[in-house]
Amino acid sequence: MKLTCVLIAAVLPLAVCQFDSTDASAYMRKNPSLRSPKRTRDCKTKGSVCFASSECCIQDCWFVCLY
């Protein structure tokens, strides 16, 4: 009985993660502009202030776009 509970507890988070990634994949298919990690539309260039690397055209960010 304990083994069954342990297995269920171990598999449940994996199943939840799988559902989340499936939803994300479907969302990416619906919106093709999100597929490419190097989107050039609305991206910031070198020296621009950034909070995440995805904001920069080349995706390197350390408070400012590095490339």
From Swiss-Prot:
Residues 25-37 form a propeptide. GO terms for molecular function: ion channel inhibitor activity; toxin activity. Coiled coil: none annotated. InterPro entries: Conotoxin. Residues 1-24 form the signal peptide. Expressed by the venom duct. Keywords: Disulfide bond, Knottin, Neurotoxin, Secreted, Signal, Toxin. Disulfide bonds join C43-C57, C50-C61, C56-C65. It comes from the Eukaryota. It is found in: Secreted. Pfam families: Conotoxin. One of its GO terms (cellular component) is extracellular region. Belongs to the conotoxin O1 superfamily. The presence of a 'disulfide through disulfide knot' structurally defines this protein as a knottin. This is Conotoxin Cl6.9.
